[in-house]
Design a protein with these regions (language model features):
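Residues embedded in well-ordered regular secondary structure
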Residues: 3-5, 9, 51, 59-170, ...
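Non-catalytic regulatory/gating segments with a bias toward low-complexity or hydrophobic composition
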Residues: 15, 32-33, 53-55, 567
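Conserved C-terminal beta-signal and adjacent last beta-strands/turns
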Residues: 144, 582, 672-700, 726, ...
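Short beta-strands and strand-coil junctions in structured, solvent-facing domains, enriched
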Residues: 3-4, 18-20, 38-43, 60-63, ...
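Short acidic/polar hinge/loop motifs at secondary-structure boundaries
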Residues: 9, 14-42
Length: 759
């Protein structure tokens, strides 16, 4: 949450830098470390501003015989905590109370599909979420071999992941990985090595619009209607129009099935290094070259179909995208280590070059032949109206860095880091970022020798600056559009269309202060880490809309604060000689705040979220309910109620500016999805050589405000949840102490999603 742009961390896998680790198999991971403070992250440069995750994969050992291991699992995935919707009886009961004209669609459901109007019983009683969802299988298999000789270590392996989606249509993810690593001591003064991964994945994506349609569409129609025998129906889906429901109502199962969206990804990741040991155990120079190439082929096809006049496709449509992404990083680092007496010293000096390039070629055509995939080519569609798009960008960076570490008797530790980072993304090409850290192992002091509470204790403190260049490679031109490289959520490569508008972009800088303590007690069975952090992002890049234009112009327009506390507790113990167990608990508190925006601007996204000074990033934005009108006299005495024809049972919105008009000027922050508190627990046990572990339990608490039950039926949507049935309306039963909004269906009313307290 430290940037208005990309907030993903940097992953360092065996010394190679990655933006994501989709290619990595979990069973290949030997160790994972999260760097929390600025002094530790600073050496990794401009991509470390959002944190660093260091991963070491499993490798062979010197003089080790070949070892073959297999790891596999089979599991299921199932949606939990689903929203409970009204059944047909509840829906009809509430609709008739809200609007007697709803009788027509309810009567049509009984006439079309059977039922009884007298007691509002329906043969059609569809739970659309149940129709869309399934229990999905997932399985993973990995086979590895590792070993080593006197001068070399090696490891190689392959893994296969198959994961089905929870939507009950053809949607899945399949991934095949091959991995190899070799380290070889060619001479006493020369060590060389190689790491490589080849990954191939196929993904079929679901039509996510079906989820919203399942929320909107009432239960009084079935999924299928076998009586519909018109030839234009590939399947006999029921249309909401059959009971008089039009506009935003669709059959979500039909939407999910009439869609074909596929991605195939080929990724090659390599790293070569050579290390020269110029002075044994003191001076070495290491040069490494990493190359990452990805090719992504995407295809989205919509066939012809007809469910109703508002849910149809008269001609096929095909869009194909080919994406190529290249990245290389060349690092050269000299490290000197020395020790005299109780003093030890390590110095590092290095340089890094990097380049990233992205190319996109996209084409769209209609009236492409249906049937086998062999016919699904852009060239076979209509030439008229076909479109072609060629897009891309290139980014370059150059960095120089140094680090000095000092350690006295493993008791006092100092660390200083300085980086000069250059980036083609900024008009101000160079940024300079220092950091400093210190640690004190108190348990090494003489005055701690006679105490028996702490087995180990260390105090830590650090301060540093980190540059962040995870912004568009636009050099300050106005970006109109953010274009996904291929369809779906699994890609993280963005493209931007630039205009002639221009701004001068300077570096986005994270200023971070950390204070922490590590201690062990009870004979090292209880270990704890406590960290307090204060992260202030200066010159945060955000893209407000230009006046009189829909264009977005990036600029250094903001300042973001993140401050909080992290607590980690781990208990390690054993019972007898063969049973070892571990219990871990993590607790976190976070305060996120937009500290400043240039010109005190208010940036509203889609009318639902806002960025404004003093509030959490991307806070919910709307009208605040302060009560419900109780009597006709109260309505008559309120100018707002009189002007809008409001009645007892309607919401009273807060008139923020006191002008007796409820409009956009009265919207305010209603809460945030960002959790203030999070916690997780992980019990683990080890019996001899077999391991059994339970899944982690994660909880979080966020101030999301309270939201009105969706009980206002507008002309385009009618959404009723089971919670609505239990809590909304019933004004007639509460004539003098109304606690629930009344049910009604009238355009322009004041019952919208707000902050109505529900109890």
């Amino acid at each position: 949450m430290g940037s208005f742009g990309d907030t993903s961390p940097l992953y360092v896998v065996d010394g190679m830098f990655y933006d994501n680790i989709n290619f990595l198999n979990n069973s290949d991971i030997q160790d994972m470390t999260i760097l929390k403070d600025a002094s530790a992250s600073a050496i990794y440069g401009v991509r470390a501003a959002n944190g660093v995750v260091i991963i070491t994969t499993k490798k062979g050992s010197r003089n080790q015989d070949a070892k073959i291991t297999y790891n596999g699992y089979v599991g299921i995935q199932k949606a939990t905590n689903l929203l409970e919707m009204c059944n047909s009886h509840e829906y009809a009961t509430m609709m008739l109370e809200a609007n007697p004209e709803a009788y027509r669609s309810i009567r049509k459901s009984v006439a079309e599909f059977g039922g009884n109007m007298e007691n509002l019983q329906f043969n059609a009683d569809t739970n659309w979420y149940d129709e869309l969802l399934r229990t999905a299988m997932m399985t993973n298999h990995s086979l590895n071999i590792s070993g080593g000789t006197e001068k070399a270590t090696y490891s190689a392996g392959m893994s296969y992941l198959a994961q089905d989606g929870i939507m009950d249509v053809e949607n899945y993810y399949r991934r095949l990985n091959f991995r190899a690593a070799l380290d070889y001591e060619a001479r006493k003064w020369l060590k060389v090595g190689f790491n490589g991964v080849f990954s191939n994945s196929q993904q079929q994506l679901p039509k996510n619009a079906a989820w919203q349609q399942a929320y909107n569409t009432p239960s009084i129609i079935p999924v299928y209607d076998d009586r519909r025998d018109d030839a234009v129906f590939p399947k006999k889906y029921t249309s909401p129009e059959q009971v008089g429901l039009t506009n935003n109502f669709n059959n979500p199962v039909a939407t999910a099935n009439y869609y074909d969206n596929r991605n195939e990804t080929y990724q090659v990741l390599t790293n070569f290094y050579a290390q020269l040991n110029l002075i044994p155990d003191k001076l070495n120079i290491r040069s490494s070259y990493s190359y990452d190439y990805s090719m992504i082929r995407g295809s989205e096809f919509t066939p012809t179909y007809y469910v109703g006049t508002n849910q149809k496709k008269e001609v096929t449509e095909l869009t194909k995208k080919n994406t190529n992404y290249y990245k290389y990083i060349w690092d050269n680092v000299a490290t000197y280590t020395d020790k005299w007496g109780k003093h030890s010293f390590t110095g590092m000096l290095g340089a890094s070059m990097r380049q990233e390039q992205y190319r996109l070629l996209e084409g769209t055509a209609t009236n492409v032949p249906e049937g086998e995939d062999v016919w699904k080519y852009i060239a076979l569609g209509n030439k008229e109206g076909a479109t072609v798009k060629d897009d891309g960008w290139k980014y370059r960076g150059l960095s120089y860095f140094t680090r000095l570490n000092y350690n006295y008797n493993d008791k006092y530790m100092l660390m200083f880091t300085f980086r000069a980072d250059g980036s083609s993304k900024y008009n101000d090409k160079w940024g300079y970022f220092p950091s400093i850290g210190a640690a004190w192992v108190i348990s090494q002091e003489p005055f701690m020798k006679n105490q028996n509470i702490f087995d180990y204790m260390k105090l830590r403190a650090s301060w540093g600056k980190l540059g962040n260049d995870k912004i568009a490679a636009s050099a300050g031109f106005a970006s109109i559009q953010n274009v996904q490289s291929v369809f779906g959520p699994n890609t993280a490569i963005d493209g931007f269309i630039n205009t002639t508008n221009f701004s001068w972009l300077g570096w986005e800088v994270v200023n971070e202060t950390n204070v922490g303590v590590n201690f062990s007690t009870l004979k090292n069975r209880l270990n704890a880490d406590i960290d307090w952090y204060y992260r202030l992002t200066d010159n945060a890049v955000i893209s407000p809309k230009l006046p009189m234009s829909g264009e977005l112009l990036a600029g250094n327009n903001g300042q973001i604060l993140n401050t909080g506390i992290d607590l980690s507790l781990n208990w390690n113990d054993k019972i007898g000689q063969d049973f070892n167990y571990n219990i871990g608990v993590n607790l976190s508190y976070l305060h996120n705040e937009v500290k400043s925006l240039k010109g005190n601007m208010k940036i509203i996204k889609g009318g639902k979220t806002v960025n404004m000074v003093g509030e959490t990033m991307n806070s919910f934005y709307g009208y605040k309910v302060i009560g419900i009108y109780q009597t006709p006299e109260q309505c008559a005495a309120d100018p707002i109620a009189v002007a809008n024809g409001l009645e007892p049972g309607d919401f009273i919105y807060e008139d923020v500016n006191g002008d007796h008009v409820i409009d956009g000027n009265d919207k305010q922050v209603l809460g945030s999805y960002v959790p203030s508190f999070t916690y997780a627990s992980m019990p683990d046990s080890l019996i001899r050589t077999s391991t059994s572990a339970s899944l982690p339990t994660d909880k979080q608490a966020a101030n999301c405000g309270t939201v009105s039950v969706p009980c206002a039926m507008q002309p385009t949507t009618i959404t009723l949840t089971a919670h609505s049935m239990r809590t909304a309306g019933r004004v007639q039963a509460l004539p003098t102490n109304i606690r629930r909004p009344r049910l009604f269906s009238k355009p322009g009313t004041n019952q919208t999603v707000t902050t109505l307290p529900i109890s």
